[in-house]
Curated annotation (Swiss-Prot):
This is Proline--tRNA ligase. SUPFAM superfamilies: Class II aaRS ABD-related, Class II aaRS and biotin synthetases, YbaK/ProRS associated domain. Consists of three domains: the N-terminal catalytic domain, the editing domain and the C-terminal anticodon-binding domain. It comes from Macrococcus caseolyticus (strain JCSC5402). HAMAP family: Pro_tRNA_synth_type1. PANTHER family: MITOCHONDRIAL RIBOSOME PROTEIN L39/PROLYL-TRNA LIGASE FAMILY MEMBER, PROLINE--TRNA LIGASE. One of its GO terms (biological process) is prolyl-tRNA aminoacylation. One of its GO terms (molecular function) is catalytic activity, acting on a protein. Catalyzes the attachment of proline to tRNA(Pro) in a two-step reaction: proline is first activated by ATP to form Pro-AMP and then transferred to the acceptor end of tRNA(Pro). As ProRS can inadvertently accommodate and process non-cognate amino acids such as alanine and cysteine, to avoid such errors it has two additional distinct editing activities against alanine. One activity is designated as 'pretransfer' editing and involves the tRNA(Pro)-independent hydrolysis of activated Ala-AMP. It is found in: Cytoplasm. Its EC number is 6.1.1.15. Belongs to the class-II aminoacyl-tRNA synthetase family. ProS type 1 subfamily. One of its GO terms (cellular component) is cytosol.
Amino acid sequence: MKQSKMFIPTLREVPSDADSKSHQLLLKAGMIKQVASGVYSYLPIAKRVLNKIESIVREEMEAIDGVEILMPALQPSELWSESGRWQSYGAELMRMTDRHGREFALGPTHEEIITSLVRDELKSYKKLPVTLFQIQNKFRDEKRPRFGLLRGREFIMKDAYSFHATEASLDETYQDMYNAYSKIFSRLNLQFRPVIADSGAIGGSHTHEFMALAEIGEDTICYTDGSDYAANIEKAEVVYHPNKKHTEENVLEKVHTPGVKTAQQLADFLKRDLDEIVKSMIVKVDDQFVMFLIRGHHELNDIKVKSFFGTEHVEMATDDDIRSILDASPGSLGPVGVNKIDIYADNSVQDLNNLAVGANEDDYHYVNANVDRDFNVKAYGDFRFILEGEPAADGSGPVKFAEGIEIGQVFKLGTKYSESMNATFLNDQGRAEPMIMGCYGIGVSRTLSAVIEQHNDDKGIIWPTAITPYEVHIISVNPKQEVQKNLADQLYDTYRTQYEVLYDDRAERAGVKFNDADLIGIPVRVVVGKQAADGIVEVKNRRTGDAVEVHIDNLQETIQSIYASFES
């Protein structure tokens, strides 16, 4: 393709609102254009890369017998009401009403549509299992779109759904998908980790996220060097080993603590370590308020709270809620004397006695509070985030932390949707049973950004060979000079039958062309310049920056050698 005919509106300056490396490079390289907050047009270079990512995804899906379909983005509310998600999904669901008053959503996922489709068409165990997938635009009304394509309101996604007669069949497809995802991300030359994760609003009993390692990542990955253990910090289990100090219970004492509102301030005031302080917080679970106790150096994990209670409806109580329950401010909460609501405590609180807690009165705290004597705990559990250095759940050693971008996720949905939507099949005994489901997503546009986050330098993008928009970039330094133009034209005509070639034939300064070439990041650059009359060109390896001068008779061999070095 001749660059003079292409649409690549590169920028010289980094846009001020671009808040990640990939966002900056996508804009500077003329690959995307913002239409609205979190909404982008994909320009020719980006579209070529997306096409290649999608091609790899299709190959691996078809290799495990996935069948491609295309479902509507516009989904009627009736189907979402059947599953119960029309009421529960939340503000991220983009809803609308047509001229006839009928309600619709722009789909963030397609569980309802696919379940409706399959329940109407597949009635016998003989037709199962089946796996259907699509690649389509999705929509989510993000409160704060950020990081360009990493958190947008419209995004491209591959979503697949499998239907089964038995759990064993689901297990097999789940593992096939897990392996296929690993192959896809390996082919994209991504550094990634599959991690144990939470299923969120989609639901299900078992799930893994695929995380691309990146400093900009919004998720924290917990892993160890001693095994392949990895978990999203939301799901990383804290293994409790009792370590109770058997000290004498002291007399409960109320202490005046003027201006003390945080656990750290209380620790400083009492001259205690932070881990000896107990924080109290009130949480609304469904329609009930409960109190949670955790040690001062720990943080409450709402995902674990949701899992413990089996609900998606968990939120921190407001200041007004707290005052109506305990007539106290958040900075002075404590369990002593609390009997209106149930009290739950993190496992590690069991190791303490003579606790320092709030007194439910501004500027006062209790010291020497003890469980059973001064207050009752209904249940203990793992309610907190793990800390770096604590033992991993599989016993393989201390956990380490890394940041990651979620680029894919696989779920075992079970019968969550088939039961609520009456998607049944007849088993070999002629009895109706709910289909057992799995669902599997890859953020295609998100993956594009993740690749750029990992593959760049201070000059621009460095594309992995599998998804580079073009394989060879021919640059005519001065197309006004006939010798240079003729040789560049000749090389373009010769090599475009063997490679995907972008030919910069523009009447631009050499510096502009070289800067654009570095920015766009095509792996091999062939520069036709002052030595064109002698048949000499410069060949540059974008990945290493190495450049050599070769005669055009040896150009093919040189290009092949560079690509061979990428493979090794």
